[in-house]
């Protein structure tokens, strides 16, 4: 889990711009199906952002 969370920051640009575009983080969740627990967690995070 920790590795997946930090994956979008290793894309080569600084952390702020990577998060602003949201490419790596959102792409990973779109590519693989979530377990029910992960889906619940993802919804909560979206609301907090």
Curated annotation (Swiss-Prot):
Amino acid composition bias (Polar residues), ranges on this chain: 8-20
Sorted UniProt keywords: Sporulation
GO cellular component terms, semicolon-separated: endospore-forming forespore
UniProt-annotated stretches for the region Disordered: 1-49
Any single biological process term in GO: asexual sporulation
Main location (coarse class): other
Keyword presence, Lipid metabolism: no
Intracellular or extracellular location(s): Spore core
Induction, as annotated: Expressed only in the forespore compartment of sporulating cells.
Pfam family, one: SspO
Protein family according to the UniProt entry: Belongs to the SspO family.
NCBIfam families in the cross-refs: spore_sspO
Protein name from the UniProt record: Small, acid-soluble spore protein O
